[in-house]
Amino acid sequence: VDAYREMLPTALENGLTPAMVKETVYQATDYPGYGRMLPFLNATNEVFADRNIPLPLPGKATTTMENRLEKGAEAQAEIFGEQMKEAWKNGHINRWLAANCFGDFYTRTGLDLPQREMITFCFLMAQGGCEPQLIAHAKGNMNLGNDKDFVIRVVSQCLPYIGYPRSLNAISCLQKATE
């Protein structure tokens, strides 16, 4: 959290909008999890307060309890292919994944789908131990136009923060995703 708090002002000064920052932090809810996300949300709010950025920011949700599953399955299909439209039927976790992760978060405004998918790749890469999901999200990134060279550049930028082992694992997963 300390490095994040230190770098956030520079990011805001160089084009990252407050909405993009908040959406990136919110995206972490479904990957590292709420417990790991909360300190970053608190740090974000503190930096925003120091910079006189008014809170709360305008809402970015686009789904309701009634349509979140449908919209989430549509987002999954756009990222991973049409076979994902029915994947939510394969168990309760799959249903939660479609409705919550993809329906509640991926459908929000403030970041576009390729940005969200790249951010998800970064969360999985930094977390470690998620290689099957990292391979899937490497493919998802490429399906959305974040080509292999771009993803390699993203891994390279993350290396000082996550270390060589996780960076090398991410490159290996990217290679598997392109086979």
Task: For the regions a language model picked out, list residue spans one by one.
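Short alpha-helix boundary/capping elements
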Residues: 1, 16, 32-33, 123-130, ...
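Short, structured motif recognition centered on aromatic/hydrophobic residues
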Residues: 4-8, 24-25, 115-125, 134, ...
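Helix N-cap / loop-to-helix initiation motif
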Residues: 16-19, 112, 145-149
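Short, glycine/charged-rich beta-strand-loop motifs at protein surfaces that mediate ligand recognition
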Residues: 109, 122-128, 141
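Short, charged low-complexity intrinsically disordered segments located at boundaries
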Residues: 20-26, 54-59, 150-154
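Acidic, glycine/proline-rich low-complexity segments that act as flexible tails and inter-domain linkers
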Residues: 2-13, 36-114, 135, 143, ...
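Substrate/cofactor-recognition hotspot
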Residues: 23, 27-35
